[in-house]
């Protein structure tokens, strides 16, 4: 039996509709902090904004789309978000 043909899914830049999901502690201003950081690094489409809290209310998820220009830009966004201390994961 042969291995299935698995293709690597590479992002083609620029990507005008790149989804970002940020998970972090539920604190006052979490959504605004995420938007502020993303806006410093990329064009943000606020019409795609979605916010949700975990069942217990401990974590908040903010989702939206940005214009992704490069791998370096995505790395910088991840680093800036994680540096806040309130962001647990960036997907």
From Swiss-Prot:
Pfam families: DUF493. Transmembrane segments: none annotated. It comes from the Bacteria. InterPro entries: UPF0250_YbeD-like, YbeD-like_sf. One of its GO terms (cellular component) is cytosol. NCBIfam families: PRK00341.1. HAMAP family: UPF0250 (MF_00659). Belongs to the UPF0250 family. This is UPF0250 protein Pput_4677. It comes from Pseudomonas putida (strain ATCC 700007 / DSM 6899 / JCM 31910 / BCRC 17059 / LMG 24140 / F1).
